[in-house]
Each structure stands twice: as structure tokens, then as C-alpha cells.
From Swiss-Prot:
Pfam family, one: HSP20
Region entry Disordered, spans: 61-93, 174-213
Gene3D superfamilies named among the record's database cross-references: 2.60.40.790
Annotated GO MF terms: unfolded protein binding
Presence of keyword Membrane: no
Domain sHSP residue range list: 76-188
Record's compositionally biased regions (Basic and acidic residues): 61-80
GO biological process per UniProt: protein refolding; response to heat
Name assigned to this protein: Heat shock protein 30C
CDD domains in the cross-refs: ACD_HspB9_like
Family membership: Belongs to the small heat shock protein (HSP20) family.
Family annotation (SUPFAM superfamilies): HSP20-like chaperones
Record's keyword terms, sorted: Stress response
């Protein structure tokens, strides 16, 4: 048999060191881990920003819709009869009808000031959004009407219908008939011809009379 030294390969390893060689895999894995964390953080931040943008758009759309409804209601109130409406013949009672459907009963105030009826409505609502923002809504409305002389301000009453119409009514006072009063006729002592002449003619006549004298 041949000795073992003869069957061994004649070449030896290039690096006969006993320590394992370093590779790039652990460092690459660490870099990818940090990159993944950064991407997740950026995605979460973008989602939060998108939620805020969506909430702002929702509030803006809601505010725009409420403004549109308010404008439509104001135009409808102006087109409707907001002036006093009398009864059948206008002699029995005084009536004023107002459209107040945008306000609840506890937001309305009706009062008389002298011979004027004043109706005011105030609406206020505060709310917090999901992202911590603050929403404040405020509306104020006012109408005034002059009471006729035949209406006693202390007898004014009002009622609110289901369709949002405020009815203000008051009975008309029964005025006593005017008494029969004779009117005297005054007599004018000036000559009728002098009244019919113009002022220049009267002056010239007066000067002629002085020359004759």
C-alpha cells in the first residue's frame, strides 16, 4: 500500500486560517430592517395626514352645504309673505307670518318694543372632530314689523306651526265712530275782482290811484 502522504492532494488551501470569513448578509438584513421601519413610519404618517385632509374636506363640504341651505331659506323667506297679513277683510285682526324653520323654539325670541314687534333667532353649535379639531357654527336672524295704530301691543300672541312658520296675531281695536261735527264757513271780505287780478295788476292799479289824487 501507498503511504497516506502520497494520496493526499499536492495543493493546499489558499487561506489556511481557522476563523470564518465575514459575509454581507447580516449588514444587509439590518439595513433592510431599518428601511422597512422607515417606510412603515412614513405610511402611518401619510395615513394620519390623509385622515386630517378628509376631515377638513368633510367639514368644508358640510359648512358649504349649510351656507347654501341658509341662503335658500333666506331667499324663500324674502319671497314668501313676511309682511303683515290681515284677516278676511283686514278689519278683525293683525297677522304676521314668518318662516323660522332653521331655528328650534328655544332659539327664538319674540318681543314688543313700543309699537314694533321684534323676532330674533340665534343658533349656536360646538363640536369636536375625531382628529382633535374644533367646529363652531353660529347663525343669527332678526325681523321687525310696525304694529298698526288699531292694535294694542299688549294683546299680541304668537304660535309656531309644525312646518316652521311663526304666526304673530293681535286683535284690532274697535275704534269709536267719529262724531258729527259741523264745520263753519268763513266769509272773505276782500272784493272778488281784486282776488282774481294778479299781484302786478293790483300794484299798477294802486299806483294809478295815487297819481290821480
Amino acid at each position: 500500500m501507498f503511504p497516506l502522504s502520497l494520496v493526499q492532494p499536492s495543493h493546499s488551501p489558499l487561506c489556511p486560517c481557522s476563523q470564518p470569513a465575514l459575509t454581507l448578509w447580516p449588514a444587509t438584513r439590518l439595513i433592510f430592517g431599518h428601511l422597512e421601519d422607515d417606510i412603515l413610519s412614513m405610511r402611518n404618517d401619510m395615513e394620519r395626514r390623509m385622515q386630517r385632509v378628509n376631515e377638513a374636506c368633510r367639514l368644508l363640504s358640510k359648512d358649504t352645504e349649510m351656507r347654501r341651505i341658509t341662503d335658500q331659506n333666506r331667499q324663500s323667506r324674502e319671497s314668501e309673505g313676511t309682511s303683515p297679513n290681515s284677516g278676511k277683510d283686514g278689519k278683525d285682526h293683525f297677522e304676521l307670518t314668518l318662516n323660522v324653520r332653521d331655528f328650534s323654539p328655544h332659539e327664538l325670541t319674540v318681543k314688543t318694543q313700543g309699537r314694533r314687534v321684534i323676532v330674533t333667532g340665534k343658533h349656536e353649535r360646538k363640536s369636536d372632530t375625531e382628529d382633535g379639531n374644533y367646529f363652531h357654527e353660529y347663525r343669527e336672524w332678526k325681523r321687525e314689523a310696525e304694529l298698526p295704530e288699531s292694535v294694542n301691543p299688549e294683546q299680541v300672541v304668537c304660535s309656531l306651526s309644525k312646518n316652521g312658520h311663526l304666526h304673530i296675531q293681535a286683535p284690532r281695536l274697535a275704534l269709536p265712530p267719529a262724531p258729527e261735527t259741523p264745520i263753519p264757513i268763513s266769509m272773505d271780505t276782500a272784493p272778488r275782482d281784486a282776488q282774481e287780478l294778479p299781484p302786478d295788476a293790483q300794484t299798477s292799479n294802486a299806483e294809478g290811484d295815487q297819481k290821480v289824487d
